[in-house]
Amino acid sequence: MKSGRVLVVALLLSFSMGGAAAEKPEQRLGQLEAEVEAAADISAVMRLQRTYGYFVDKGMWADLAEYFTTDAVANYPAGVFIGKPSIREHLFRNVGNVPMGQVGLGDKRVYNHFSIQPVVNLDPGGQTAKGRWRVIAMFGNFGGSATWAEGLYEMQYAKEGGVWKIARLDYHSGFGAPYATGWVAPPQPAVSAVPAPRRPRQLAHPADRERDASCEGFPAACIAPFHYANPGKGAGSPVWTVTAKTSPASGDAKQRAAKLLSKARQLADEQQVESLLRTYGFYLDRAYWDQVSDLFADDGTIEFAQQGVYVGKKRVREFLGKLGPHGLVTGWMNDHMQLQPVVTVLPDSNKAWSHNREWAMTGRLGEAGQWTEGIYENQYVKQGGVWKIKSMHFYPTFITDYDQGWAKDAKPAPGPLADLPPDRPPSSVYAIYPKAHVPPYHYNNPVTLKPLQYPTVGGPSAREIAQAQASGETKSLEPVRDLKVAADEIERLVGRVKAVHEIENLSSAYGYYLDKNLWNDLADLFDPQLGSIELAHRGVYRGPKVREFLVKVFGRGGQEGPVAGRLGNHIQVQPVITLSADGKSAKIRSRMLQQMSQGARASWGGAIYENEAVRGADGVWRYSKVNAWNTFTASYDGGWTKAASSGMPGPNPELVAPDSPPTRTIAMYPVVYEIPYHYANPVTGRNSLPPLIPMAAQQAQLRAQATPAAPTSPASAPPGMPASVAAGLREIGAKIDAAKTTALYAPLHAALQHDAVATRRDLAYGPHERHRADVFMPKAPGAPRPLVVFVHGGGFSRGAKSSAGQFYYDNIGYWAAEHGLVGMTINYRLAPEFKYPAGAEDLDRLVAWLREHAREWGADPARIFLWGHSAGAAHVADYLARGPKAPVAGAILTSGVYQLGDTVSVWKDYYGEDVALYPQRASLTRLIQVSVPLLVNWAELDPPDFIPDTEKLIAGRKAGGKPMVSLRLPNHSHLSETYAVGTADQSLTSPILKFIEAPPK
């Protein structure tokens, strides 16, 4: 067997259990029996929770009800259910909404329930255990609604009759959100509003009592209690700690050792198979078809949906080649997360099975993104000591366009390929969502050990169930000839199994601490001397600077803990863990998926981690290296194919200087770059990967694609605006449609690089958390420059200076710095919590602060220009109309409101319900008179409410001879006029530069 072929638990570890070497082999067996039993217990608990999620998926309530102890407590949002009978009735009648005894969801229903990111610990004594799991749920009805949910389970397990069951379930909600909007915070009620009383949910089976105290989750700021101590702090949080069994197992010493050796090998094999299927997912992401096909046995088979069966490694490779080119190309998103593995290894055999979930995010730049979710039922064979895929069968649950979601779109299962007919027809004929379909599972109920009770609607046939069942002959126990050799082998195997569990706990805890901004807890996961961290282009921080970096850069100088109204989920999954030969260090490849939200914008992000960990002298595993390779970031509105940003955060030397510069140059989707694997192919040892187009060439290609076509006419497409964008804006019309407008402009910004610009983020210009500014400065030295400050819109109650995964409004800051200015984007206090004149007061505070600090960024405090858009323009107008204490050099007003009507609700959120006060609060009359030079513009496709105010302002200033430049932007909309900043379309930016260079007098 060649080096590198065994991925996770190559059986080479020399694992010490204090003083074992000095004991006789017979004396060691009691401790080894306790260790192996503990390892088996952890495996059983994880199997229990993962299968729990699969049974919820398909409405298999009868099997699920068996998971609870007689006196179990289930603390759900709907209330607390006590005892197995009550929980059983809750599952059928409340969750399933079906009569007692009826299983299955029926057609047109999605109820996916991911159980992922485990931190599992066995309690002393081995009779109880605890686990923390993240839940991602997709609910919905075709033609009805679609909903996201995320939360945490804090579970308590207990052995009842020697079988692991759930003793207590506590669900802590993270968020629930409609698919249409994603995870954004709901509008906050007015300060004076009386909170509506919480009405208990009407249940078919009432709860036994109201729910126990729990973390309500986003947008509230709370932390679900951790059952474990910090895994890296002090003695850590061992996955188990056991003492030798005082009652030895039956049989003589060699018979006992033979049983232990068999079980230890089985547990180690389970982990190897888990890593094999996770490795498959990482190769699939990158379209490395050679590497994927290498994982199959020579006679292996592959079957996707209704496409038929391909037999043999060569045919597997041919089929994979039909999925796309060998290796990712620019603009191709192909993420395939492999989650929730349930692995069965037949004892003392070379056979194994797995059941796992795939969650895929795919698509091409500018086209519709696509969701796929489904189940793999695979078989494996061990040949020459190496596990290989014997058969792979993927059963999709649903396939749907990102733009529409699973309530509105449901694509059929792909059928046979006309240009590559399969070797055999599909194993079974079925339809996928919106039809109900339950694939056959290879395992029985892990509690009752009885066959599963499948739904009659969409369930598998008896033939399919029999074919899928894990079965086969097992060899008799291998006799032990040398007791010491056997004991050493058992010790080594169970030590490696334990190490993998503890490293997975470490990885999961990293994500949970990052979720809640627990920077010091996060820093405790690092080895204090050897630890290092490198994220994006921020540079490398080592040793004590890891904590300083986390606290000062991410914690903004000491902000610790969750913040109300902000979501920052860092979902850590799919770890491939490779232990060193001596068992003292490990390398870990894992995946991170982000769900982020602040204000009215939700976003996605992704990364691959290539980390390293060491086991200290105290036996505790800690990180020696964390290295994140960001892959994509995108707004929720447009998704990854239409609203992705390839920019990468750089160093923050003004906060904490890195110990060394970045070790690599990377750019996110739509650019594709090589992410190194710490391992060779686990089956063949292959290291070679298909070559990628250099990043610079990809960026040039994207810029070329973004080059505007010749306009069909000057009126339909201004110079620099691609004809496709012009047509898209015409189609949207006067509607403010952020998702569609973002989709038009995101590809143009994705091609842009800003290497000549330095940034400083989240500078505080006042005491409130919304008093924050980002500065964009040319790196090249020069004389003091004009400072242009952009004030965002958002209907007075939402919006931000920048949005995670989105180009706006960083595009304005970058544009300013690239044109010889200092750019700034700001946040300010929002309605309805803060009403008129809060916006003007914030600008007053800002300008005073700028006049004091502008020189720090190379800006001239005498040349400050305010640029407001929409509600931001109204705030700038109010600031000027009130008579600013610190005058500015000029102001740019883009599509603002200056004369208030009495029927627009968003104005009432900020300007108040008393419309009698509107005449004195409206800025128009005074704005006409101010002496500050103005550039006033509006867009041809602005909503009708905006245009009259602008026309009145322009007419009034012209009549009074006040300094002003005015312009109308043809074919632009309310959003596109700012989204276009930084692109080749200079309809607005060219006049702004001239205005700043020589303001009218």
Segments and roles (model prediction):
Residues 783, 849-870:
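Gly/Ser-rich "nucleophile elbow"/oxyanion-hole loop immediately N-terminal to the catalytic nucleophile
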Residues 930, 936-938:
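Short beta-strand/loop motif that positions the catalytic acidic residue
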